[in-house]
């Protein structure tokens, strides 16, 4: 395999560890924990793994441990740093006993169920250190939810002599890890399950998890591209760039990219929902910024749009909820079948409430058809297929035309469209993510060595130098509550949304009027791996603002 000069040089980078993990450790137990919501229900569902204490690791004395094997799974969408979680786990497991083995299950949780695996040797591991992607073993979206899956899993775990399984994933994957840990504990199978927090969307965080890995690198990658567009925008001075960014459930990426690049407009889904703004309100807000800048002779600008914006507009959210109900067959839980598209649209229009029908008919015809017709296998609207950036620019253009006829707008408006998603998922990890991910993996090996199960590996205090980071573990049940998913109440890890009273949003809100009126663009440039600390090792602005740095 031919590799680039950068990858060769980057392979030599030795990720930094918290001081506590640089030698033998001892586990210090805190108070018993409770779930963030629905305590009685969660306790009843997880009697063997509920109420466990938070763990903090400190320097300890070396212990001789018998050899054991560990399995690892990459679950869900890719995020920069996944390979470093595995390399940290590999090095940690080998440090405990050189005879220990690490097995990777191929293409996600499905590899566990289908008994598809490989041993990760030092020769294989060394090819992937400090690289982006999940290609060492691949990833998948199989959900571990059924007892037959758990039983198929234990067959191969026993065959390979695996004592512990590490699941690297987001909120849904770690919810499944918690369910699996509880099942194996209840059955007394003797297999530990540990989670590691991953998602570039940044929505797996709470008082215990400062950030999910990959968020830092992905945001810096998108911010470079936005900065490049803004430099072009300020050079040609004739286009408005509508840029959609990943983040269906939360607007963390859009907010962080705004803090890094200072665009003219950044929409925050959570604010739009809180203010109960309509789609027309959003369009009017953007159009006013365009008109005000045009009055100053600036016929250009940038608009950042979170991927999930549409689902946060209350009227459309209500419409989508009813569409999901009427287009799902209650008998099967699957999508209803129709002879043709027109029959389906007629059924929708005759089935939904009048206020929802009015919202549907207010949308551009192609978007309304898309909402009615594009479904997933469960009958749910495929919101991610809606090109929100194009929808908004078309509606802004229409409003500006109306204003021009009324004499309220003089100027030109020409739009360009972008969607940044896959560009950031497999980028080579920043120094922050390389260190953070390696520490998460190494820390997971310490949780295994201390006999823990149903825990998530956590590293805190990450705005400080790596030596001062705090390593430990948190019971996954602590992060859970009951939510309605696909028509049923289920225990899930609560997603973290942008907090409108939090420091990152408040900083943005205090500056956005100035950024809207003036061209205050910042050009972050590409992720840097070598050079001064202020260039190479800085965490996200979100994290620094949250910690008052």
Would you name each region that the model predicts?
Residues 1-23, 316-321, 333-549:
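C-terminal non-catalytic interaction/assembly regions of soluble proteins
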Residues 1-18, 63-113:
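N-terminal phosphate-binding or glycine-rich loops at protein starts, especially the Walker A/P-loop
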Residues 24, 30-63, 112-163, 200, ...:
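Glycine-rich oxoanion-binding loops at beta->alpha junctions
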Residues 65-73, 128-140, 198-210, 235-238, ...:
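Gly-rich Lys/Arg/Thr-decorated short loops/hinges at beta-loop-alpha junctions or inter-strand turns
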Residues 75-77, 105-110, 141-142, 170-171, ...:
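Short, ordered loop/turn segments at secondary-structure junctions
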Residues 79-89, 112-113, 145-150, 171-179, ...:
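Short glycine/serine/threonine-rich phosphate/pyrophosphate-binding segments
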Residues 100, 164-169, 175-192, 207-412:
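Accessory alpha-helical/coil subdomains and C-terminal extensions
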């Amino acid at each position: 395999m031919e590799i680039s000069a950068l990858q060769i040089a980057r392979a030599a980078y030795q990720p930094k560890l918290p001081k506590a993990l640089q030698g033998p450790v001892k586990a210090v137990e805190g108070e018993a924990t409770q779930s963030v919501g629905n305590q009685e229900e969660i306790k009843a569902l997880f009697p063997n793994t509920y109420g466990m204490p938070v763990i903090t690791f400190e320097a300890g004395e070396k212990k001789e441990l018998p050899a054991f094997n560990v399995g690892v799974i990459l679950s869900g969408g890719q995020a920069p740093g996944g390979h470093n979680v595995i390399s940290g786990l590999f090095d940690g497991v080998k440090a405990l006993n050189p005879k220990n083995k690490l097995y990777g299950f191929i293409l996600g949780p499905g590899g566990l169920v289908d008994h598809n695996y490989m041993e990760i040797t030092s020769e294989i591991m060394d090819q992937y250190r400090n690289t982006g992607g999940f290609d060492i073993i691949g990833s998948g979206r199989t959900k571990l939810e059924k007892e037959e899956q758990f039983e198929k899993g234990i067959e191969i775990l026993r065959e390979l002599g695996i004592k512990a399984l590490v699941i690297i994933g987001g909120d849904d994957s770690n919810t499944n890890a918690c369910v699996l840990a509880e099942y194996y504990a209840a059955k007394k199978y003797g297999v530990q399950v540990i989670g590691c927090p991953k998602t570039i969307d940044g929505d797996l965080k709470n008082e215990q998890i400062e950030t999910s890995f990959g968020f830092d690198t992905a945001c810096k990658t998108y911010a470079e591209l936005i900065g490049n567009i803004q430099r072009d925008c300020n050079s040609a001075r004739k286009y408005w760039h509508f840029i959609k960014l990943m983040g269906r459930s939360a607007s963390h990426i859009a907010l962080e990219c705004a803090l890094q690049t200072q665009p003219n407009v950044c929409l925050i889904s959570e604010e739009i929902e809180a203010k109960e703004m309509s789609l027309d309100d959003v369009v009017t807000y953007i159009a006013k910024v365009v008109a005000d800048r045009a009055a100053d002779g600036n016929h250009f600008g940038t608009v950042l749009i979170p991927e999930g914006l549409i689902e946060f507009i209350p009227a459309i959210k209500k419409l989508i909820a009813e569409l999901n109900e009427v287009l799902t067959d209650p008998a099967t839980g699957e999508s209803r079948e129709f002879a043709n598209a027109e029959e389906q649209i007629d059924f929708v229009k005759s089935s939904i409430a009048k206020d929802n029908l009015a919202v549907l008919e207010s949308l551009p015809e192609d978007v309304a058809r898309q909402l009615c017709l594009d479904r997933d296998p469960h009958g749910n609207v495929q919101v991610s297929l809606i090109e929100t950036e194009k929808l908004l620019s078309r509606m802004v253009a229409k409003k500006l035309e109306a204003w021009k006829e009324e004499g309220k707008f003089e100027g030109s408006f020409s739009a360009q469209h972008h969607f940044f998603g896959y560009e950031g998922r497999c980028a080579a990890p920043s120094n922050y993510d390389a260190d953070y991910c390696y520490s998460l993996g190494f820390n997971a090996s310490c949780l295994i060595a201390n006999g823990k199960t149903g825990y998530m590996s956590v590293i805190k205090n990450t705005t400080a130098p790596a030596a001062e980071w705090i390593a430990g573990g948190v019971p996954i049940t602590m992060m859970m509550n009951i939510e309605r998913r696909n028509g049923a109440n289920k225990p899930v890890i609560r997603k973290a949304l942008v907090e409108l009273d939090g420091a990152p949003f408040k900083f943005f809100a205090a500056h956005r009027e100035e950024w809207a009126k003036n061209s205050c663009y910042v050009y972050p440039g590409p992720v840097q791996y070598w050079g001064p600390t202020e260039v190479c090792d800085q965490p996200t602005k979100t994290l620094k603002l949250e910690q008052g740095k």
